[in-house]
């Protein structure tokens, strides 16, 4: 597991209060982890703060899963 993935998972567990075992790469924030639209906005803000990046609204609207977040963050950080 990459450092980015570990940090993303930690943020998700903290913000959504879900079991870390449920936070797998293909887990959907809404369908699998029980997030609502406000939760997803808060997750994006937490990712921005944790990784020191900006996630534009149009990009945020394409981040649905743990893997989507990890891929975007890795690309934005490189």
UniProtKB/Swiss-Prot annotation:
Q: Has keyword Cytoplasm?
A: yes
Q: Which GO terms describe its molecular function?
A: acyl binding; acyl carrier activity; phosphopantetheine binding
| Carrier domain segment(s) | 2-77
The PTM O-(pantetheine 4'-phosphoryl)serine maps to: 37
- Identify the pathway: Lipid metabolism; fatty acid biosynthesis
InterPro entries registered for this protein in UniProt: ACP, ACP-like_sf, PKS_PP-bd, PP-bd_ACP, Ppantetheine_attach_site
* Tree of life domain: Bacteria
Bilayer-spanning residue ranges? none
Keywords of this entry: Cytoplasm, Fatty acid biosynthesis, Fatty acid metabolism, Lipid biosynthesis, Lipid metabolism, Phosphopantetheine, Phosphoprotein
Which SMART domains does the annotation name?
PKS_PP
Cellular compartment(s): Cytoplasm
Q: Can you cite an annotated GO cellular component?
A: membrane
**PTM remark:** 4'-phosphopantetheine is transferred from CoA to a specific serine of apo-ACP by AcpS. This modification is essential for activity because fatty acids are bound in thioester linkage to the sulfhydryl of the prosthetic group.
A GO term (biological process) for this protein?
lipid A biosynthetic process
What role does this protein play?
Answer: Carrier of the growing fatty acid chain in fatty acid biosynthesis.
Family of this protein: Belongs to the acyl carrier protein (ACP) family.
Q: Enumerate the HAMAP family for this protein.
A: Acyl_carrier (MF_01217)
* Protein name per Swiss-Prot or TrEMBL: Acyl carrier protein
In its UniProt entry, the species of origin is given as Bartonella bacilliformis (strain ATCC 35685 / KC583 / Herrer 020/F12,63)
Query: What taxonomic lineage is listed for the species of origin?
Result: Bacteria, Pseudomonadati, Pseudomonadota, Alphaproteobacteria, Hyphomicrobiales
């Amino acid at each position: 597991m990459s450092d980015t993935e570990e940090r993303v998972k930690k943020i998700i567990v903290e913000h959504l209060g879900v079991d870390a075992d449920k936070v797998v790469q293909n887990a959907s924030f809404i369908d699998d982890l029980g997030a609502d639209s406000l939760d997803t906005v808060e997750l994006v803000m937490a990712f921005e703060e944790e990784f020191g990046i900006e996630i534009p609204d149009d990009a945020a609207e394409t981040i649905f899963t743990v893997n989507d977040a990890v891929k975007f963050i890795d690309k934005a950080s490189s």
